[in-house]
Design a protein with these regions (language model features):
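Cofactor-pocket helix-loop regions in the catalytic cores of large enzyme subunits
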Residues: 1-210
């Protein structure tokens, strides 16, 4: 109240993280509290974690809500980029007892790979933890895509796709070797990760901010 009295109502900001949507009390009553603050500055994980998925889904599938949800109970290869569901309980893929479900992938012969600059709780139980240089996730992804095209590992004949050749052309110069220098992941690791993902029967890539 003192800050707002001296600097105006909008001098106070509110940030709501992912756990907010896992708490019924916050979901049903937080708006009353926020209304009392009378600030227009409301922030959440949505701007960095959620909205990019909606935009991508709109561009790829025609609607912002057509976001693919990982089938954690049936996949045999799960690649997690930046996500830490053991701490956040997942986002989009919110499931009870997520640790048990991730370990079930391993028990049925599958593989869990986590890409994260730090050894998160989820990375600690993964079959493979790939340390990536902070801020260089895009370089790693470009290296993976380049390998998929370079080694003819794409299988899109059963899907209605468009402009795949444009993607292939755009990614042509982003070799695993070139991207390794950017992201800090060895080129051999990038290539093997792409091969493992492509060769799995039911692979899924899950990317979040936490």
């Amino acid at each position: 109240a003192d800050i707002q009295a001296r600097h105006g109502q909008n001098a106070v900001a509110v940030y709501q993280g992912n756990p907010s949507v896992h708490n019924y009390g916050l979901m049903t009553h937080s708006n009353y509290f926020l209304g009392l603050l009378k600030t227009r500055n409301r922030f959440s994980a949505t701007s960095v974690d959620q909205l990019p998925h909606h935009l991508t889904s709109h561009l790829m599938y025609g609607h912002g809500l057509l976001i693919p949800i990982p089938d954690i109970d049936h996949t045999d290869f799960m690649l997690i980029l930046g996500g830490n569901p053991l701490a956040s309980n997942g986002s989009i893929m919110t499931v009870p007892d997520v640790e048990k479900r991730l370990k079930a992938i391993q028990k049925r012969g599958g593989k869990l790979v986590v890409v994260d600059p730090r050894r998160s709780e989820t990375a600690a139980i993964a079959d493979q933890h790939v340390f990536v240089r902070p801020g260089e996730d895009a370089a790693l992804l470009c290296g993976l895509l380049n390998t998929l095209f370079d080694e003819d590992l794409t299988r899109a004949s059963h899907l209605p796709v468009s402009d795949l050749d444009a993607v292939r052309s755009a990614i042509a110069g982003f070799t695993a070797e070139a991207m390794s220098a950017r992201c800090g992941v060895p080129a051999a690791t990038i290539r093997q990760l792409a091969r493992d993902f492509a060769s799995a029967d039911k692979a899924v890539c899950y990317g979040r901010m936490g």
